[in-house]
Curated annotation (Swiss-Prot):
Quaternary data: Interacts with INCA1.
Gene: DPH7
Protein name: Diphthine methyltransferase
UniProt biased composition (Basic and acidic residues): 378-390
WD repeats: 79-130, 131-185, 186-229, 230-273, 274-313, 314-403, 404-448
Gene Ontology MF terms in the entry: diphthine methylesterase activity
Length: 452
């Protein structure tokens, strides 16, 4: 049997766009969720007036909140319990470092103030909390759009420096170093990578001196950080803005990319002229995540098309289109965040199937313009990128397009999880725990996925 079962829906109050499970042993029950809320002047109470009686115009404000949840498998009704909330500038991206640093788990945030923040996980009375550790402003008047750690592959060399690559709304990439003794952020290099927003930056986990970037100019680029500013390749294979990239932590030469063009491409990094496979997913691909244990499974947050789980086995080995194993759309919402849990998930018992209401148990927010996240408009700009590439303006189809009505699901009522060092052979191939977050209904969803 194969299917996705809803365990819980949490109202995040502000619109949610980023969700990340902690990968570190002993902390894998912890889930971070970031939010992004655009507050326009008209949303505020009546403001002050100047002496002439005219209203003082205030700029738009991007608000954010960081939530930390603990997964408790002894509570079958509400397994996710909030343990901390922290108001911040709006959050565009988050990533946990894959290794402990100075004895602590570290969470990196990319925020709307143009900064990369480091937060340290510390034990509290009953659980854990995140406390500020370091912050670095990338540039003036920009939004920090993404970040990635250099530690994605198991078995990091002891002499390998700890690095972060980040991207911003001006099209720049920023290479940062993290001092592991007294964790602090230090900028190593910055360079112009794209003409417009650099939506995503990511390491090659097997060769962390190599990074990749995707921009709103529709370009996918590779860079050698030892020679900042000189690209290794430029691919125009995506036809709209490139907004998601992840190197496989399991297979050395495999890279996945996603775009507003609603396609996921798999690449062999030894030949970036042509992808191994091209899979349409009917929605802009904001985030993609390889499964922590099963090398062929890829999770994708596909905006108005919900989330999808792909089997990439044949795509990698036979250059065939990846198989979409699971596809779930959520009415009146945009799925921007998705992540696999590192917990081993076993011994599930389920109640009879039932149908969710259309809002999946949360209050549905009024629909707002797609510009709440820094998403471009729907039309194409025929600007030229200087390389003979007519620049398509990234956009999304109407939110209602392709959305399904209420679906029938099974509710999981009990589970057993294990947080420990994992031998891939021990991981139960049938069950996985995952989380997604959606924008307009400000909701965090917890799912159990059962595969073959």
């Amino acid at each position: 049997m194969m299917g996705c079962f809803a365990l819980q829906t949490v109202d995040t109050e502000l619109t949610a766009d980023s969700v990340e499970w902690c990968p570190l042993q002993g902390c894998r029950h912890l889930l971070a969720c970031g939010t992004y809320q655009l507050r326009r002047p008209e949303d505020r109470p009546a403001g002050p007036q100047n002496k002439g009686g005219m209203e003082v115009k205030e700029p738009q404000v991007r608000l954010g909140r960081l939530f930390l949840y603990s997964f408790n498998d002894n509570n079958s009704i509400h397994p996710l319990v909030e343990v901390q909330r922290k108001d911040t500038s709006a959050i565009l991206d988050m990533k946990w470092c894959h290794i402990p640093v100075a004895g602590h788990a570290l969470l990196g945030l990319a925020d709307a103030s143009g900064s990369i923040q480091l937060l340290r996980l510390v034990e509290s009375e009953k659980s854990h909390v995140l406390e500020p550790l370091s912050s670095l402003a990338l540039e003036e008047q920009c939004l920090a759009l993404s970040l990635d750690w250099s530690t994605g592959k198991t078995g990091r060399a002891g002499d390998q420096p700890l690095k972060i690559i980040s991207s911003d709304s001006t099209g720049q990439l920023h290479l940062l170093m993290v001092n592991e003794t007294r964790p602090r952020l230090q900028k190593v290099a910055s360079w112009q990578a794209h003409q417009f927003e650099a939506w995503i930056a990511a390491f090659n986990y097997w060769h962390p001196e190599i990074v990749y970037s995707g921009g709103d100019d529709g370009l996918l680029r590779g860079w050698d950080t030892r020679v900042p500013g000189k690209f290794l390749f430029t691919s125009k294979r995506h036809t709209m803005g490139v907004c998601s990239i992840q190197s496989s932590p399991h297979r050395e030469h495999i890279l996945a990319t996603g775009s507003y063009d609603e396609h996921i491409l798999l690449w062999d990094t030894r030949n970036m002229k042509q992808p191994l496979a091209d899979t349409p997913v009917q929605g802009g691909v904001w985030r993609i995540k390889w499964h922590p244990f099963h090398h062929h499974l890829l999770l994708a947050a596909c905006m108005h098309s919900g989330f999808k789980i792909l089997n990439c086995q044949k795509a990698m080995e036979e250059r065939q289109e990846a198989t979409v194993l699971t596809s779930h759309t959520l009415p009146d919402s945009l799925v921007y965040g998705a992540d696999w849990s590192w917990l081993l998930f076993r011994s599930l018992q389920r109640a009879p199937s039932w149908s969710f209401p259309s809002n999946l148990g949360t209050k549905t927010a009024d629909l707002k313009g797609a510009s709440e996240l820094p998403t471009p408009c729907h039309e194409c700009r025929e600007d030229n990128d200087g390389e003979g590439h007519a620049r398509p303006q990234s956009g999304m189809k109407p939110l209602t397009e392709g959305m399904r009505k209420n679906g029938t699901w099974l509710q999981a009522t009990a589970a057993t999880t294990r947080d420990c060092g994992v031998n891939p052979e021990e991981a139960d191939s049938a069950f996985s725990l995952l989380a997604t977050c959606s924008f307009y209904d400000h909701a965090l969803h917890l799912w159990e996925w059962e595969g073959n």
